[in-house]
């Protein structure tokens, strides 16, 4: 069973390159301080790693 992670957008995508913006959008994050909960699959964790300078990640039980 994969762990769940809560991802919060804490920095704006203004001034970021287009691939970074698309990655943030594909994670389901739209506005600043928006949060989503996702399964901690390798695909999701790879996307989080690519935008780690913009998001905060918390592991859920």
UniProtKB/Swiss-Prot annotation:
Q: What is its quaternary makeup?
A: Part of the 50S ribosomal subunit.
Membrane-spanning residues: none
Q: Report the HAMAP family cross-referenced here.
A: Ribosomal_uL30_B
By sequence similarity, the record places it as follows: Belongs to the universal ribosomal protein uL30 family.
Which PANTHER family does this one have?
LARGE RIBOSOMAL SUBUNIT PROTEIN UL30M, MITOCHONDRIAL RIBOSOMAL PROTEIN L30
The organism's taxonomic lineage, starting at the top? Bacteria, Pseudomonadati, Spirochaetota, Spirochaetia, Spirochaetales
Name the source organism: Treponema pallidum subsp. pallidum (strain SS14)
Q: Cross-referenced Gene3D superfamilies, in alphabetical order?
A: Ribosomal protein L30, ferredoxin-like fold domain
GO MF annotation: an example: structural constituent of ribosome
Q: What is this protein called?
A: Large ribosomal subunit protein uL30
Concerning Pfam families, the annotation shows: Ribosomal_L30 (PF00327)
This protein's GO CC annotations: cytosolic large ribosomal subunit
Task: Note whether Ribosomal protein occurs among the keywords.
Answer: yes
Q: CDD domains from the xrefs?
A: Ribosomal_L30 (cd01658)
Question: Which keywords, in A-to-Z order, does the entry hold?
Answer: Ribonucleoprotein, Ribosomal protein
The keyword Ribonucleoprotein belongs to this UniProt entry's keyword annotation: yes
- Biological processes, Gene Ontology terms: translation
Q: Which PROSITE patterns match?
A: RIBOSOMAL_L30
